[in-house]
């Protein structure tokens, strides 16, 4: 029996998770992003949303709650949450202008 296709939201969530694991563990521990893996993920997958972030090293430090120089999925998820909040703000401004 074929699985039903994912909804747009389900596919988006799967993409967020898959992207993390595509980049995580290439250098350091599997299941976490090293500094270089984080930079590679951001520059390849988030170039438009994080173009004004400033130093990626500083952004990494702000997300790295346990300060182990790696991002676990929960720390990476904080970045996704921050980006979603910014997009929501932009959408709210667009709605107000209408």
Swiss-Prot record:
Subunit structure: Homodimer. Part of a copper-dependent multiprotein complex containing S100A13, FGF1 and SYT1. Interacts with FGF1 and SYT1. Interacts with IL1A.
Name recorded for this polypeptide: Protein S100-A13
Function: Plays a role in the export of proteins that lack a signal peptide and are secreted by an alternative pathway. Binds two calcium ions per subunit. Binds one copper ion. Binding of one copper ion does not interfere with calcium binding. Required for the copper-dependent stress-induced export of IL1A and FGF1. The calcium-free protein binds to lipid vesicles containing phosphatidylserine, but not to vesicles containing phosphatidylcholine.
Residues that, per the record, bind Ca(2+) 2: 64, 66, 68, 70, 75
Pfam families associated with the record: S_100
Subcellular location: Cytoplasm; Secreted
Modified residues (Phosphoserine): 32
Single GO MF annotation: RAGE receptor binding
A single Gene Ontology CC term: nucleolus
